[in-house]
Structures are given as structure tokens and as C-alpha cells.
Amino acid sequence: MEQWEETFNVVFHWILTASAIVGNGLVIYLVIFRRRLNSTANWFVLSLAVADFFVGATFFPYQRVCKSEPCYKRHIHWLCVDVFLCASVTNLCLMTVDRYIAIVKPLKYLTIMTTRRTLLAICAAWCIPIVTALLPLSWTYSATSPANKAISWKVFTFATLIVYGITPFVFLPLAIVRILLIVRRCRLERSAVMAQLDFNYSGLRRNRQLDPEKEISSTRLIVCVVVMFLVCYVFGVSVRIASVFGHQQPPESVLVTSSILILINSAANPVAYGLMKRDFKRELLKTLKINNSSSDLAIEEVL
């Protein structure tokens, strides 16, 4: 890689790192300190934002500090970086499940997603990656032979690939397709009901509009976040597959592209919250002290 390319990559990585930290930090601030954002759905957003915040804070800085091979230790990498990448994956899956329940079983949502269950689910989404990151310590500092340690790493890498790589890439698209089909069916049923009301009671619809915008924005958000994740993590999963089944190190261009996409994913999620969640957009505009009504109109025109 030429000098100018390396310089550009480093600068671009730092820009994405700063964007991920600032953007997710702002999301964390809004959910914690804005009472109107204290809802069950936003707790999952908060948990994902915390994971993405630490992805931004650790991913590239660790690469720069431990660029040389003697500094790099796989178990330290898991404790410092991969734990937050895995937490980002588990929290995204959890948020998808939450939206799936809200759309598939809207009448039972409040009884299913109680405060206790929500907190337990968020704790599980963090505890599983933490336990995973601690597992390598059990053989790294043990008296087992180097051959057994190598086998342990192979099994561990394969298992984490299945849990945090393959499974989300199968589960998330299926969940999104199911959500979109249900939303489409509900919109068709709503249109049929409104058409019947228009036919039976002229003028009623003008006075009593159904407002599906909240449901639509919620659906758009989860679809956008999941699609962004799938696009940005496909290189990372491919690199992990190559490390498990291949015998050659992936090209440097693939590794650079993978790291850039991972940071883009963490930096883009706050943008999606601000543009597609009306409550976030409203509180963000208040925080930035922008006139709410005029700014809302401007953003709606852009969207």
C-alpha cells in the first residue's frame, strides 16, 4: 500500500471513529436525560448505542496501538474489541425481536415486553458476549500444550462464527421479511377499512384520520439498521470464515474494507435514529435549539 493510501485510510478511520463516538454518545444522552424517550423500545436502542459507542472507541484505536504482531494477542483482542462487536450483534438481534413482537403481536406487546423481561433481555445481550470474551483465558494461561491451545482456538473461532456471524445473517433477513409482509398486510386491511368508511360515511375520514406514521417509521428504522448491518458486516464474516476454513491470510484490501464498513455501521446507526424515529428527531432538534416546526418541515421535505 502506498504512503498516500495509508494516510488516507488512517484519516478516514479516525473520522469514522469520531463519528461513531459522537453520534452514539448523543443517542445515549438523549435516551437517558430526555424523559419522553424513556420507553421500552428506546431501551433497546440505548443498549445498541452503548455497544456501537464502544466499538467506535476501541476498534481502530486498538488496531493502531497493536499494529505490530508482537503486541497483538488474540485473547486481549477479544476482551478489548470483539466483545463490543458481538454485543452490537446481540443487541441488534434483540431490537429486531422487540420490533417483531410489537408488529406481530401488538395487542400483547405490553404484557410480553414487561420492564423485568426487557432488563433481563438486555443483560443477556451483554452477558453472552462478555462470557464469550472471557473463555479464551481458560486455555491461554493454562498449562495445556500449544497443540491443544491451537485446537481450542479453532473450535472457539468456529463456534463464535456460527453464533455471531452465520446465525444473525440467517435470522435477521427472515425476521425483516416477516415484518414487511405483516406491515404490508396491515396497510392493505387499513386501506380497505378506510375505503369502506369513505363509502358509508362521507366526510368521516376527513375528520378522523388514522395515523400510521409511527408504525411506518418504526418499520423503516429496523429495516434500515438491519440492512446496514448485513451490508457492513459481510466482509467481516467473510474474513472470519476465511480464517476458520482457509490457510491464507485475506488480502490487506479486504481487511481494510472490512474495518471501514464496521465503523460505518456503528457511525450510521445514530443517523438512522435521528432521521427515522420521530421522537428522536424531535428531542434532537430541541437539544440543538433549532426551531422544531420549521426544521421538521425541512427534514420531512428531504425525506
Regions found by a protein language model. Name each.
Residues 1-6, 33-38, 110-114, 149-155, ...:
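Helix-boundary and loop/linker segments of multi-pass membrane transporters
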Residues 2-18, 40-112, 154:
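Extracellular TM2-ECL1-early TM3 structural module of rhodopsin-like
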